Amino acid sequence: MVPEAWRSGLVSTGRVVGVLLLLGALNKASTVIHYEIPEEREKGFAVGNVVANLGLDLGSLSARRFRVVSGASRRFFEVNRETGEMFVNDRLDREELCGTLPSCTVTLELVVENPLELFSVEVVIQDINDNNPAFPTQEMKLEISEAVAPGTRFPLESAHDPDVGSNSLQTYELSRNEYFALRVQTREDSTKYAELVLERALDREREPSLQLVLTALDGGTPALSASLPIHIKVLDANDNAPVFNQSLYRARVLEDAPSGTRVVQVLATDLDEGPNGEIIYSFGSHNRAGVRELFALDLVTGMLTIKGRLDFEDTKLHEIYIQAKDKGANPEGAHCKVLVEVVDVNDNAPEITVTSVYSPVPEDAPLGTVIALLSVTDLDAGENGLVTCEVPPGLPFSLTSSLKNYFTLKTSADLDRETVPEYNLSITARDAGTPSLSALTIVRVQVSDINDNPPQSSQSSYDVYIEENNLPGAPILNLSVWDPDAPQNARLSFFLLEQGAETGLVGRYFTINRDNGIVSSLVPLDYEDRREFELTAHISDGGTPVLATNISVNIFVTDRNDNAPQVLYPRPGGSSVEMLPRGTSAGHLVSRVVGWDADAGHNAWLSYSLLGSPNQSLFAIGLHTGQISTARPVQDTDSPRQTLTVLIKDNGEPSLSTTATLTVSVTEDSPEARAEFPSGSAPREQNKNLTFYLLLSLILVSVGFVVTVFGVIIFKVYKWKQSRDLYRAPVSSLYRTPGPSLHADAVRGGLMSPHLYHQVYLTTDSRRSDPLLKKPGAASPLASRQNTLRSCDPVFYRQVLGAESAPPGQQAPPNTDWRFSQAQRPGTSGSQNGDDTGTWPNNQFDTEMLQAMILASASEAADGSSTLGGGAGTMGLSARYGPQFTLQHVPDYRQNVYIPGSNATLTNAAGKRDGKAPAGGNGNKKKSGKKEKK
């Protein structure tokens, strides 16, 4: 600031100069001479010869009344009229003359008369480094809590250096320590101030106080400095320090704002209660000089108001530092900065006019598409009338200026209606005044839709499970599909397509609602007819071009118990009579009832029971096998004709059933009848008969030939069957010849007793000893069957047939799991135990496999090709006493018939796999050999 006396002198000088200029305007224009001298020159220091420099005559100076007419500045310089030299007359202190102005100039006015002339002399006072930096206090004390986090800043006292330029204050230095670092900041007026930054957490117990030294350095040569001792006391303070809601506040005030005008209110909060939460506001310690004279701060409310007179030409921006402390015992301070901008009055805001708007805009509009034209006007002049426009950042639009105050709104990025269907653009126009005034207008831009999204679904495929015999027309699936496009492009149409080579499935079985995607069945579905459907749902939208999506729909039909069991044997409507000799012991196998069910799983599991007979105590039936046997010995008092009604029930819910009727004829006990049911241990009386030896020789020769032929056939068939599926293997010759393996399979199926094989049979009407023998030792086709099973599925082979993994062509010992126990084997009098408590198969797969194999053997017997010693369809029994088991083929019965299990479960085959010989296997072989010898 220029001293008031110096300003008054300048004003007086200006008035004199103005008068002289008016008087001498007609004579001669004034001349300006420039000099530069350092400050603090001693009195009498020669500045320059002004007379010579002005071209005046030295001898006429007195006559022309040469004099210095400047006001306050004339005391600093004098002119020697004898020599014309101008010299320093008083101490020149640049800091006193010009303060902090970057340039300091003293102007002198010289006047001569006759004629009147006015001359101006400007002397630039150059700064020298003659002032040390100085701190306003001798020392500084800080109280810092040990809980202060590293990185916290603490403002320090600012030093002041009256010099300017490089001679002014340039930097600060801090003595070395392990806790604090110094950060030197620059104000907007280029002055420096220092902050103390905590780099390492304090520990009051370790160091309760710290002594630091702050040094201020200027840029002169040599550099001058000043030091400020800093005493830091480490305190245990309250938990929470005040916190400003923002670290930087900005305010703008007019330079003619009166005293008391509110500038801004700072706000700090403290989470503590009581005195520790009461905040006191104060100015920071490093504010520039003059801030406290121009502004006032309310200690309680934090309101900053104007106190003095603001001068825009002096300072345009005030940087004020405010600290807040609580009233706790160890208060911690928070600091914020307030920027107060002093501006000239700018009382006209811009005005925005939207001349045209192109809306809606297609979402596929190219970049640079013009959306709107805007014109902006401002009644102010100069910089206050220069206007700029802008749109918020992050939007796909931009403003460009084509002419002055005219702007074009264009697209700058791709539009997406599905993301943002409409924009309300806030266009802001600002002038260049200080403070800048602005205007805001809203431009509404709608985005129109194009068909750029296909129908979408949460699932790419659906698996639907529906129970058979469903209600036609009932919904079975509702497709969840949507299209994010606009309604006109999102109108969906649903169609069903067929997969694979099958056609007609859609029209026969299913339909879909074209509008809502609900799939319905046209007819009741039948599990036994078809179990799975593969469809494709085709969904298209209503846009142009049409976009579509395909969804796979797999429909699985589940089974219901809708089929009652059917009787395979005895044949319904036929006459089946089973022969039973009198005197037969308990447990004798009389016959077997065979049923099947077209359902699957538990719905196809069958159980057998007797409904009624003339003598309830004579017969018993296996619950799961259907085997009918004698429950007690046949007595003479029993009726010669017994009619049995067997109830066959499945395991479904609700259970369905059917009945089968079987007639048993009780015959007189005779030698012929006993010959047909001989005892395994009874000696044969005809061993020495010549006919027996002749037949035996013939059989041995025949067997040798048959074995050779079958060996070749089995080898060829074995090679061919290795690549075939198990279910496609031929089964017509499965039980044609007896043998150990055939014996095991027959017993496993529960069809007959093993003692019905390798026996000598006589017909009831025979009058001579003509034994009928089966062909012993013939090569069994079952070996080829077993090799095929082993190659297709070794695990199933071992479980079902109980065979070892023997080399092809080698018969494994029979699995005793499928044999009857000794007590259950019928002898000559049929002593088999009739109480069969066999277990169910483990799963549906095992059930259906056993059904297919055993029914294949039953079909073999029905064809009349069995060589088990009986007549056509007798399953190996004699023509007189065997059941007439002629089967009728039922479509698909091989896949659905369930023949319940035997006396052993499939899991017992583990002993076979473990390498243990099945119990009773060798005994059966020995018994068979004894029979053949006899």
Swiss-Prot record:
Topological domain (Cytoplasmic) residues are 715-934
- Write out the ranges of the annotated region (Disordered): 804-843, 904-934
**Residue stretches spanning the membrane:** 694-714
Keywords per UniProt:
Calcium, Cell adhesion, Cell membrane, Glycoprotein, Membrane, Repeat, Signal, Transmembrane, Transmembrane helix
- Give its localization: Cell membrane
Domain spans labelled Cadherin: 32-135, 136-244, 245-352, 353-457, 458-567, 572-685
GO BP, sorted A to Z? homophilic cell adhesion via plasma membrane adhesion molecules; nervous system development
Skewed-composition ranges (Basic residues): 924-934
Q: How does it sit in the membrane?
A: Single-pass type I membrane protein
Q: Signal peptide position in this chain?
A: 1-31
Return the Pfam families for the record: Cadherin, Cadherin_2, Cadherin_C_2, Cadherin_tail
Main location class:
membrane
Q: What does this protein do?
A: Potential calcium-dependent cell-adhesion protein. May be involved in the establishment and maintenance of specific neuronal connections in the brain.
According to UniProt, the name of this protein is Protocadherin gamma-C3
